[in-house]
Design a protein with these regions (language model features):
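Short, charged, surface-exposed secondary-structure boundary motifs
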Residues: 124, 182-191, 228, 306
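CE4/NodB-like, metal-dependent polysaccharide N-deacetylase domain
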Residues: 129-153, 246-260
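Extended alpha-helical scaffold segments
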Residues: 651-812
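Short His-Asn-centered micro-motif
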Residues: 73, 152-156, 176-178, 219-221, ...
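Active-site and substrate-binding clefts of carbohydrate-active enzymes
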Residues: 2-56, 78, 192-514, 539, ...
Length: 812
């Protein structure tokens, strides 16, 4: 019987990045060329791990495998929620992998659950810990269609109370770092053996007896190998990775042994480029050579029940040498890179959030008891609404959790109370403390969640809690002199992000001027309908006045908003917005302002605007981030076209100088070089974006760029070229007989070769292999020799080699 077992666990997680008021991730410039970091990491890691390439002869792709089906993994619930909306194909591949793994691992699934929003459990109160576990379990059941056997703890942070809560809710096991074991003993023996600095023996399962009489199984991963995977170069070779795992099995092995590691899942592709391929080849090499049995924790436990007991080291984690201090003190653990920076801000940040949570808890209880006997049980059940905000599902939630039929305003209040509690847990997401500076993107994110809590608290309870909250944050020093402290960070990054029905109405009012508005639309998690929208234009000036109905799809809050957009300085527009006035007042204001605008009296328009709507502001400031970027791009588009026209004249006029530059070895003036590079970049992007690419022009420009060493925007051009090739390959997959499309793909690949673009074409390669399978299994009629010749050439340029495509050629 095989006694050598290997399990690789990936903890796939990103902190929630959604704007708390909009429930969507806004544009993040640092993730360029992607929209945001979720999108970028999904492209680099989550997606390719579902179709990871295994290389054959000539270092060409021979097949692709779903890594998730052969490893143990967990995904953060908030990340899966984002993927379900924005990367549905990749999301479905993850769910499918869990089902596939059940056939492979004795009906045990590869996926395990995670505490809901990555809260450091030992630092949470028991009530939040319980909700985190309940929400994590229910989210898992909703997505994977089964109960989870195990659960991942954020940062593997643990104490006995946390384990008790896991066991209470049916969780069978969790995974910890080796230094988190305190002492062990063989089942049936009385004497405990302390675990020394070297750590616990990681090659077996342990059972942890709990004070309540319950128990939970614990796996302690191999620390040295995990560190080499995460922080060294072990992923440069799948064979080396496999050999490193195999190398720690005892030579004289008579009993089953489990070699297993746990790392951030993002290690496989995001932190280490093409790390997914090292993982897939490692697993393939081990299985195909019968070097060990690849398994997962649930299967291993069933086959080999624990023979030893363990007690944990209390309040420890995998990423802090000081226990869990990284998330509440200046313990010295940090990312580094900023010499002299401290983390003295961590303690006051946690103190501020703890104060906010504990201060608002009695208010929540008092107000929720008007609708339900157990306010905290209602919060536990709220995950059903978070998972499905369909109106009927929310109505069912009210019926199941509230005492009586609720009025419309009562439903709004219940939802607001529960949203306050949801954000009061989101604000404890661990990443807010993990990094070096409170004003970093992660610190700002949890402060924004706190900002949403404060806004809801003021609206619900009529009290201002913000002042004292900021007072505590004043004791959280920033490392950046201009930001001073946490209170200043809050004022700079949180307060401007806050919005409400009026803010959403202002966004719509301005954005509608740049759209073909159709009477209303969705604005993130709000529904907007036009009640009045009157646009007037005269002598190049624009005036809009209107009324909008705005409704939150989250809290069901609704109301009307009045707005006006008027000419500002220069070509700018100014806008003002307010809660709706009476019908009669609005009608009078509408008529008065329209009359004055028609007369051309700009000063009077400004006076009336301030009188009836309040102070105006530059219209684009009312827009949310993505719409600001879109409209700004539209506004400057005409200017860019004008630049292009002038630059193109220069480019064409001085083109002969390029030949002289080469023959005489003379450098072009920098200004002329800039003009030429601008045109070459524009032409490359335009050619690659067109449905029918002019291959001749593409070849000519690529040759010019290489010949004369012009600089191109390789990141952007690579991204556009990659998207174009993937699109064409997917189209070809739907209609493999389309020779012209196949030729077009091959032509683009050959034409862009001189540019040395960074093309990660795994999606195109997957389509190629799918077409090859159609030929191999006979679902595609035997192709003509010309098709096979071109298909083989395309495979060469895509660096794909498959038995299916070879077999297809031999069968003709």
């Amino acid at each position: 019987m095989m006694n050598r077992y290997i399990c690789i666990h990936g903890h796939f997680y990103q902190p929630p990045r959604e704007n708390p008021w909009l429930e969507e991730v806004e544009l993040q410039d640092s993730a360029h060329p992607y929209h945001d970091w979720n999108e970028r990491i999904a492209a680099e890691c989550y997606a390719p791990n579902a179709a990871s390439r295994i290389l054959g002869s000539g270092k060409k792709v021979s097949r692709m495998v779903n890594n998730y089906a052969s490893m143990s993994f967990n995904f953060g619930p908030t990340l899966l929620s984002w993927m379900e909306r924005h990367a549905p194909e990749d999301y479905q591949n993850i769910l499918a992998a869990d089902k596939e793994s059940q056939a492979r691992f004795s009906s045990h699934g590869a996926a395990i659950a995670q505490v809901y929003n990555h809260m450091i459990m030992p630092l949470a109160n028991a009530r939040d810990e319980r909700t985190q576990v309940l929400w994590g379990i229910r989210d898992f059941e909703h997505r994977f269609g089964r109960k989870p056997e195990g659960m991942w703890l954020a940062e593997t942070a643990v104490n006995t109370r946390t384990l008790e809560i896991l066991a209470e809710h049916g969780i069978g096991f969790t995974i910890l770092a080796p230094h988190q074991a305190a002492r062990v003993r063989k089942i049936g023996e009385e004497k405990w053996t302390p675990v020394k600095d070297a750590g616990v023996d990681p090659q077996m399962a342990y059972v942890c007896p709990l004070p309540s009489g319950k128990k939970i199984h614990l796996f302690f991963y191999d620390g040295p190998i995990a560190r080499e995977v995460a922080f060294a170069d072990l992923l440069e070779s799948g064979v080396n990775f496999a050999n490193r795992l195999l190398g720690v099995f005892p030579r004289d092995q008579h009993h089953p042994r489990l070699v297993h590691i746990a790392t951030d899942g993002e290690t496989y592709g995001h932190h280490h480029s093409f790390g997914d391929m090292a993982l897939s080849y490692c697993l393939h090499h081990i299985a195909s050579q019968n070097l060990a049995q690849v398994t997962i924790y649930g299967e291993y436990l069933e086959k080999f029940p624990a023979t030893h007991e363990v007690q944990i080291a209390e309040n420890t984690s995998w990423s802090c040498a000081h226990g869990v201090e990284r998330w509440r003190s200046d313990c010295g653990c940090k990312i580094g890179g900023h010499r002299g920076w401290h983390q003295k801000w961590r303690a006051p940040l946690r103190q501020a959030l703890d104060w906010l949570r504990d201060t608002l808890a009695p208010f929540y209880e008092e107000h929720m008891r008007a609708f339900a006997a157990d306010p905290w049980a209602v919060r536990d059940s709220y995950i059903e609404v978070i998972l499905d905000r369909d109106t009927q599902n929310v109505e069912n939630f009210f019926k199941q959790n509230c005492r009586a039929e609720l009025k419309a305003e009562e439903k709004v209040k219940v939802l607001r109370l529960l949203e306050l509690q949801r954000h009061a847990m989101l604000m404890y997401t661990s990443c807010g403390w993990f990094f070096d500076e409170i004003s970093g993107i992660e610190g700002v994110q949890i402060l924004q969640y706190a900002g949403r809590v404060l806004q809801l608290a003021q609206e619900l309870f009529g009290e201002d809690f913000e002042g004292h909250f900021k007072k505590i944050l004043e004791a959280a020093p920033s490392n950046i002199a201009d930001l001073c402290n946490g209170a200043a960070v809050y004022e700079k990054f949180v307060v401007p992000a806050r919005t409400d029905l009026t803010g959403v109405g202002a966004h719509y009012a301005v954005s509608a001027m740049f759209d073909d508005h159709t009477g209303g639309k969705k604005v993130y998690c709000y529904t907007v309908r036009e009640q009045v929208y009157d646009l007037k234009q005269t002598d190049g000036r624009t005036f809009v006045i209107g009324r909008l109905y705005v409704r939150s799809d989250i809290t069901w809050e609704e109301g009307s908003v009045d707005f006006v957009v008027v000419p500002g300085e220069g070509q700018h527009l100014s806008a003002a917005v307010r809660a709706s006035m009476s019908e009669e007042d609005f009608r009078d204001v509408h008529q008065e302002m329209e009359k004055v605008f028609t007369s051309g009296d700009v000063r009077e328009i400004d006076r009336l605007t301030e009188r009836h709507f309040g102070a105006t502001q530059y219209a684009l400031k009312y827009l949310f981030r993505d719409e600001q970027k879109r409209i700004f791009d539209e506004v400057i588009h005409s200017a860019m076209e004008e630049f292009e026209e002038h630059f193109r004249e220069i480019y064409e006029h001085y083109y002969p100088l390029l030949q002289a530059k080469e023959e005489l070895h003379i450098a072009l003036p920098k200004a002329l070089n800039t003009c030429i590079e601008f045109i070459l970049n524009r032409d490359l992007l335009d050619l690659l974006a067109k449905e029918q690419t002019d291959i001749g022009a593409l070849k000519r420009i690529a040759v010019e760029v290489k010949r004369w060493a012009f600089e191109i925007d390789k990141t952007r051009i690579s991204f556009v070229a990659m998207q174009r090739i993937i699109f064409l390959m997917r189209s070809l997959e739907k209609d493999p007989r389309d020779l012209r499309r196949m030729e077009s793909i091959d032509d683009i690949l050959r034409a862009t070769a001189p540019l040395n673009l960074d093309l990660d074409l795994w999606r195109a390669q997957r389509s190629y292999l799918a077409i090859a399978r159609q030929v191999f299994d006979g679902s595609l009629p035997t192709p003509e020799p010309r098709w096979l010749e071109l298909f083989r050439k395309l495979g060469d340029h895509l660096h794909v080699h498959s038995e299916q495509s070879e077999h297809s050629e031999r069968s003709v």
